[in-house]
Structures are given as structure tokens and as C-alpha cells.
Amino acid sequence: MLLMNLFTIINNDVPTPYNMYFQDSTTPHQEGILELHDNIMFYMLTVLGLVSWMMIIIIKDYKNNPITYKYIKHGQMIEIIWTILPAIILLMIAFPSFILLYLCDEVISPAMTIKVIGLQWYWKYEYSDFINDNGETIEYESYMIPEELLEEGQLRMLDTDTSIVIPVDTHVRFIVTATDVIHDFAVPSLGIKIDTTPGRLSQVSTLIQREGIFYGQCSELCGAQHSAMPIKIETVKLPTFLTWLNEQ
């Protein structure tokens, strides 16, 4: 048992103090975002290293002999290099980013739809595909739990009294809007960040590939209690989701 515990994977699905990297991904979208970030960082560090090396060489040579390049006015070859090379690097960055941008905006045959409504300062969720025993759409509101009411293990400024419950490995579409001001529905582990605009319906899809609890927050300054709009998503197995659905 101890050996099994040593090899247990503990995913980072919540913000942690002094964390310098992303939360662990749980969707293909976030995997693509992480890969694009790492690729761009590679190009940035390569350019930084190359330019720094050139600057050091130039400063060193000039220090040894200030008049070495006194009469050099231009260099055609170096001008060609510093024009073409950055263009190639930008193209290598642009093409993957355009592809990822297109894929993140594409909504592919969702199995279920959840409507998200942002209000000052809480969220409202509607499961438009399901109705309860009274023939009404399943909907509820989600408020942040005040710090003085938090139980052991709950997270300050992140835990809510209700959460979005989603079956794992299911294509889910979020349709988002707002009733008052612009909010932003953002969950880092899912790679989701989309504005909720009054009078406008926007959509984003996701496929969560593992069970867990994922947190997000409103990421658009929306008023005095902007920080009191956390998002909590629970991903469960399909039988557990159906049981939860029957209880609503």
C-alpha cells in the first residue's frame, strides 16, 4: 500500500502560492495551450541567448579595439539575416497558434449543454437539456462560501455552495451570457476563458478527461465584489452524474 501511495499522481488543480507554472491540464484544449506556451518559450529563449551572445561579442571586440569597424557603414548579408530569420520564427509561432485558436473555438457535437449566466456577484447555471419532475429546466445559483463558514479542506475565495457537475469524458458546451455587466467565465485547468456579455450568447466547448474538482474565477473586473465570483466544477462518472441529476 505504501508503495502504491508513492506512485500516486497528485494533480495540481487549484492555485498555489508562488506557483510559476500552469495548473495541470484536464482537457485537450489546455494540453494544446501548454504545448504552444512551451514552444514559444523555446523560441524566446533561443532568441534571447543568440542576441545576448552577439551583444557580448560586439562589446568585447569594441572594447579591445574601438576603431576596428570605424568605416563600416552597412552589411548586406547581416541585414538579410536579421530580416529573414525573425520572419521565419514568427511564422513558426503563428501557424500553431492559429490552428489552436480555431480548434478552441470549434464546438463539436456536444452531448450536453449548460447555460452560464453571470450576475453581480454570483453565477447561475441552467442544464437546458434536462427537466425535473415538475417539468422545469434544472437551474440553480452558485455563491462563494464566506471565509467564516468554510469547513476543513475548503478553499478560501474558491469554494462555492453549489457547483457545476459534469460527467467525465463527455463533450460539454457552455453557453454564456450576463444580465448586468461583462463578466468572464474562466477555468484554468480546462483551458476556458470567455467573456459573458449582456445581451449576447457566446459558446465554448470542453471535454474533461479525468475526474476531479476544478476551480476558476470571474476574470473580468465587474464591480466591488468581483473577487467573490468563484467557479467550481466537479467531474464525476456517468452513473454518479445521473444520480445527482435525479436528485435535482
Swiss-Prot record:
Membrane disposition: Multi-pass membrane protein
GO MF annotation: an example: copper ion binding
Transmembrane segments: 40-61, 80-104
Alphabetical keyword list: Copper, Electron transport, Magnesium, Membrane, Metal-binding, Mitochondrion, Mitochondrion inner membrane, Respiratory chain, Signal, Translocase, Transmembrane, Transmembrane helix, Transport
InterPro entries in alphabetical order: CcO_II (IPR045187), CcO_II-like_C (IPR002429), CcO_II_C (IPR034210), Copper_CuA (IPR001505), Cupredoxin (IPR008972), Cyt_c_oxidase_su2 (IPR014222), Cyt_c_oxidase_su2_TM_dom (IPR011759), Cyt_c_oxidase_su2_TM_sf (IPR036257)
Residues annotated for Cu cation A2 binding in this entry: 218, 220, 222, 226
Entry's localization field: Mitochondrion inner membrane
Required cofactor(s): Cu cation
Top-level EC class: translocase
CDD domains: CcO_II_C
Keyword Signal applies: yes
Mitochondrial intermembrane compartment segments: 13-39, 105-248
Catalysis: reaction(s): 4 Fe(II)-[cytochrome c] + O2 + 8 H(+)(in) = 4 Fe(III)-[cytochrome c] + 2 H2O + 4 H(+)(out)
Topology Mitochondrial matrix: residue spans: 62-79
Modification after translation (UniProt): The signal sequence of COX2 is processed by IMP1.
The keyword Mitochondrion appears for this protein: yes
Similarity annotation: Belongs to the cytochrome c oxidase subunit 2 family.
Cited function: Component of the cytochrome c oxidase, the last enzyme in the mitochondrial electron transport chain which drives oxidative phosphorylation. The respiratory chain contains 3 multisubunit complexes succinate dehydrogenase (complex II, CII), ubiquinol-cytochrome c oxidoreductase (cytochrome b-c1 complex, complex III, CIII) and cytochrome c oxidase (complex IV, CIV), that cooperate to transfer electrons derived from NADH and succinate to molecular oxygen, creating an electrochemical gradient over the inner membrane that drives transmembrane transport and the ATP synthase.
Name of the protein: Cytochrome c oxidase subunit 2
Gene: COX2
